[in-house]
Amino acid sequence: MGIQKLRIALKAYETSLLNDSCTQIINAVETGGVKAIGPIPLPTKRRIYCVLRSPHVNKDAREHFEMRTHKKIIDVYKPTDDVMENLRKLDLAAGVDVEIKSL
């Protein structure tokens, strides 16, 4: 019995890189003739950092910085060996973190 489902989780700080990577993965899966569901957007995580502007005085003067982590999931049902090989050959952007699980 082979793999029934692949879950591909993508994370990135920039939405444009994430969307481009999603389209590349979906195109690679669809060329193999396999059904893919997604990309399913997940909630965006926000990390906010508060930094003092001055090193010594003026505690009231502060700056806020935020990092947003965008996530998406793609489910691939009954992947074949050709699809797995297509996914391995993909060259995705450096700012995108890809995690693949077999379910």
UniProtKB/Swiss-Prot annotation:
Record's subcellular location: Plastid, Chloroplast
GO cellular component: chloroplast; ribonucleoprotein complex; ribosome
Pfam families: Ribosomal_S10
Biological process terms in GO annotation: translation
Matching InterPro entries: Ribosomal_uS10, Ribosomal_uS10_CS, Ribosomal_uS10_dom, Ribosomal_uS10_dom_sf
UniProt GO molecular function: structural constituent of ribosome; tRNA binding
Protein keywords: Chloroplast, Plastid, Ribonucleoprotein, Ribosomal protein
Plastid in keyword set: yes
SUPFAM superfamilies: Ribosomal protein S10 (SSF54999)
Family: Belongs to the universal ribosomal protein uS10 family.
Functional note: Involved in the binding of tRNA to the ribosomes.
Subunit description: Part of the 30S ribosomal subunit.
NCBIfam families for the chain: PRK00596.1 (NF001861), rpsJ_bact (TIGR01049)
Entry protein name: Small ribosomal subunit protein uS10c
Chain's gene name: rps10
